[in-house]
Amino acid sequence: MVLEMLNPMHFNITTMVPAAMPAATMPILLLTCLLLLIWNYEGTSSIPGPGYCMGIGPLISYARFLWMGIGSACNYYNKMYGEFIRVWICGEETLIISKSSSMFHVMKHSHYVSRFGSKPGLQCIGMHENGIIFNNNPALWKVVRPFFMKALTGPGLVQMVAICVGSIGRHLDKLEEVTTRSGCVDVLTLMRRIMLDTSNTLFLGIPMDESAIVVKIQGYFDAWQALLLKPNIFFKISWLYKKYEKSVKDLKDAIDILVEKKRRRISTAEKLEDHMDFATNLIFAEKRGDLTRENVNQCVLEMLIAAPDTMSVSVFFMLFLIAKHPSVEEAIMEEIQTVVGERDIRIDDIQKLKVVENFIYESMRYQPVVDLVMRKALEDDVIDGYPVKKGTNIILNIGRMHRLEFFPKPNEFTLENFAKNVPYRYFQPFGFGPRGCAGKYIAMVMMKVILVTLLRRFQVKALQGRSVENIQKKNDLSLHPDETSDLLEMIFTPRNSDTCLGQ
C-alpha cells in the first residue's frame, strides 16, 4: 500500500481529496485573510498613511526612503497623506510629523531624546552610543552633552567672534586658493575652510591640513548619509559598503592623530589655563575615567564637522539669496554701516543686527539645510490624540512645517515673514527642549559674523541666472546642493573698487 501511494503511476489524487471543495471553504479563507489584515493593522489604523497590505506596505515605504532620500520621502508622504502620518522604515513603525503642535510635544518631552538609525551603519561611522549627534543611548548622551554646552556658550561664544573675524580675513586675503580658472569663487569650499579653521582654533587648537580635512569631512558626511538607514544585509556584502568604510576611516584616523598631538601638548604644558578648551576638558574626563578614548575622539570629530557640514551650506544659500534680492542686500548693508561702521564686528554688535538676524531666519525657513529631526519614543504616549507606542520612530518634518503655518507669505522669500515676532513653536530651525541643537547660539553668532565681515568687503553675484530655486539639490539626511552640477560658484566684486573676481 505504501509503495502504491509513493508510485505516481498508481497514485490516484481523487482518492485523497474530495471531488469538490466544500462551499463554505472559500468564505472561511477570505474571512481569515481579512482578520489577518485587521490584526496587522490594529493599533495604528487611526493614523493616516499607506496600508500594511500583508507586509507589502512596509517594504514599499522603506524602499522609497532608500531610493528618494529621507527628506524627499518625508515630503512625499506628508503631501500624500497629511501632516501626521505613519510609514515603516526597516520594518519599524515610523511617524512623519509636520504639524507644529505635535512637534512641540515631541521636542519638549524627555522621553523623545533618543535617535534612531541602522545599528551597523551608526557603528561604522562611530556614532552608535557615542558622541552627541546620533548617540541613541540617552544615558551616555547625557554624559557628553555638558561638554558641548560648556564649549558652545559663555566665554567660548565671546572668543569665537574675534577668532572668526580673523579667520575670514585670512581666507579672503588668499581668495585665489578657492577661485576657479574662470575667476569665480568656490563659495562652499571657502565657507567650509573658514568654519573648520574657526572651530579648530576654538575647540582643539592643533595645526592641520585644512583643505585635506575638508575633503575628508565631505567623504564622512556622504558615508553617514548613505549608511544611516541601510538594512543589516547591506553590511554583510563588503564590496557594497567598503568605500564608505574607507571614507569614515580616513577622517577618523586624521582626527585621532590631531587629538593625540593635543594629548602630548597638554602633558608638556606648564600652564593648563592657556589650553582649557573643549578637547582639553574631554581628555581630562578620560583621565578621570568618565569617558573612553573612543568617546573623546568621536566628540572632537563631531565638534569639528558640525559647522563645515551644515552651516557652510546655510551661508552658501544665504549668499545666493542676497544676490537675487538687491533690496535685501541694501537693507543689510545699511544696518552694517550703522551698527558696525568701518571697524571689525564685536560681540556687543550681535544683538543690534536685527535686519541681519531676520534675514538669517528667513533664509533658514525658506531654504533650510537641516529640515528634519529624527527621534524615537522611549515610552508609550499620545500625541494630538494619536497613540504612540514605545519604540516608535519619529521624523519631524520641520522644513515643511515652516511653509504651512503662521507665516503670511510662506512660499516666498521675504523679510515680511519676520516683520512681527514669531512664536517659537512655529519656527524651529535648531529645535528646542532637552535634545535641541547644542550649538544654536554660537551658530547664529557665527553666521552674523561671517555675513557682516564678508559683505563689507565684497558684493556677491550668482552666475547665469542661478538662484536657490533652480540649483539642483539632494534632500536626504540634510538638504545640500548637488555638487556634481555646474555653476555653483559666485562672482565676488570688491566694494569701492573697479576690480572684480569672476568677470
Curated annotation (Swiss-Prot):
EC annotation from Swiss-Prot or TrEMBL: 1.14.14.14
InterPro entries, alphabetized: Cyt_P450 (IPR001128), Cyt_P450_CS (IPR017972), Cyt_P450_E_grp-I (IPR002401), Cyt_P450_sf (IPR036396), Cytochrome_P450_Monoox (IPR050196)
Domain of life of the source: Eukaryota
Needed co-factor(s): heme
A GO biological-process term: lipid metabolic process
Residues reported in the UniProt entry to bind heme: 437
Topological category with respect to the lipid bilayer: Peripheral membrane protein
Compartment(s) where it occurs, according to its Swiss-Prot or TrEMBL record: Membrane
Cysteines paired by S-S bonds: none
Major localization class: membrane
SUPFAM superfamilies, sorted: Cytochrome P450 (SSF48264)
CDD domains: CYP19A1 (cd20616)
Biological role stated in the UniProt entry: Catalyzes the formation of aromatic C18 estrogens from C19 androgens.
Family: Belongs to the cytochrome P450 family.
Protein name according to UniProt: Aromatase
Gene this protein is translated from: CYP19A1
